[in-house]
């Protein structure tokens, strides 16, 4: 991931094709990104992604979330968000730990590899 930061991942057009797009409840958005999106920039920098939040996108008041960037990083962010909002206690705890980690440390290649090995429903060969 440090190579991506040095080379500027945003200069790679492939990272902008097929963005991850999903809707999120307002309270979950505030929990993850903070009041007034206080943690949004930190999450973007630490995950090498660009995250766009469109509030009140749906009639139910949900926020439309669009994530672009390297595929493994996008999937990591989406899985963290999914786990934070999970009703399963173990997933919720894992999601909160992932959230605390990304708020304080940039993701490393090892973080992404461990994540893909330890319970993600996606697998990518090297």
Curated annotation (Swiss-Prot):
Taxonomic lineage from the root: Eukaryota, Metazoa, Chordata, Craniata, Vertebrata
Family per record: Belongs to the KHDC1 family.
Organism domain of life: Eukaryota
Name under which the protein is recorded: KH homology domain-containing protein 1B
Gene (UniProt): Khdc1b
Single GO molecular function: identical protein binding
Coiled-coil parts of chain: none
InterPro entries given in the database record: KH_dom_type_1_sf (IPR036612), MOEP19_KH-like (IPR031952)
Keywords: RNA-binding
Acyltransferase among keywords: no
Positions of the KH domain: 19-78
Disulphide bridges: none
GO cellular component terms, A-Z: cytoplasm
Tagged with keyword RNA-binding: yes
Signal peptide (from-to): none
